[in-house]
């Protein structure tokens, strides 16, 4: 297993129709897997929500978090819905981001599970669009799994813009920092082995889409499985 990303592969210019995946310590970086029209869809949805009275919430409002621990603004884009603590047998598909979740549950997860077969078939069905201003960020080391969210197996982050300075997705034990680059996605294990944080952007704001792949034990239209 590679311990570090290949810096040449990580930074080389790619043609419009070229896409690559680089792996290191169970962290996968998908370069150029999302195009301009995909990115604009999220930003247009954020603007539409804002113009129609649906506003993003900061961490203090949503979690009671102190801004020195974590601060950003997020707008949910959940696809699944829960009842009585259990996922319904069919996930709802009447949603703005159907194509995104189908792409995640086919192209993205299949490539990851090809590299790491024991991951199984987790499903991406929820996420959020997140905006981080200079000096803001997720400052504390954390994982994406705990007793309240035991189904989470992988986390993902899609960068919606370039950040010239700062704003890295940083992994503590792996000593890896990933620079935000528009159209790139990172997928990594949700567990304690991959403690991470989102560093403050220094040169301007940072936009991402982030969420999780969960072991739900269901087959549905999202994954094109019967």
Per-segment meaning from a language model:
Residues 2-116:
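Non-heme Fe(II)/2-oxoglutarate
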Residues 34, 46, 160, 213-215:
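Short beta-strand segments enriched in hydrophobic/aromatic residues
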Residues 48, 134, 159-163, 191-192:
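Glycine-rich, acidic and aromatic/proline-enriched surface loops and short helix-turn segments
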Residues 118-133:
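Acidic, glycine-rich loop-and-strand cores that form catalytic or ligand-binding grooves
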Residues 129-149:
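Conserved short histidine dyad/triad with adjacent acidic residue
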Residues 140, 148-152, 163-226:
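Catalytic core of Fe(II)/2-oxoglutarate
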């Amino acid at each position: 297993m590679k311990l570090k990303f290949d810096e040449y592969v990580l930074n080389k210019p790619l043609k419009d129709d070229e896409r690559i995946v680089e792996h290191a310590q169970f962290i996968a970086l998908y370069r150029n897997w999302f195009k301009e029209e995909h990115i604009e869809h999220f930003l247009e949805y954020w603007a539409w929500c804002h113009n129609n009275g649906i506003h993003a919430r900061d961490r203090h409002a949503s979690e009671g978090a102190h801004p020195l621990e974590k601060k950003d603004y997020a707008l949910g884009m959940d696809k699944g819905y829960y009842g009585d603590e259990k996922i319904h047998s069919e996930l709802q598909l009447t949603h703005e981001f159907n194509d995104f979740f189908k792409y995640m549950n086919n192209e993205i997860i299949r490539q990851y599970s090809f590299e790491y077969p024991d991951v199984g078939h987790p499903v991406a069905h929820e996420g959020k669009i997140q905006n981080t201003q200079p000096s803001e960020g997720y400052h504390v080391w954390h994982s994406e799994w705990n007793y309240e969210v035991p189904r989470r197996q992988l986390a993902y982050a899609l960068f919606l813009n370039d950040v010239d300075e700062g704003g890295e997705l940083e992994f503590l034990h792996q000593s890896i920092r990933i620079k935000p680059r528009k159209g790139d996605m990172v997928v990594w294990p949700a567990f304690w082995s991959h403690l991470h944080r989102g560093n403050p952007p220094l040169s301007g704001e940072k936009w991402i889409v982030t969420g999780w792949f969960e072991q739900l034990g269901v087959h549905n239209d999202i994954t094109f499985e019967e």
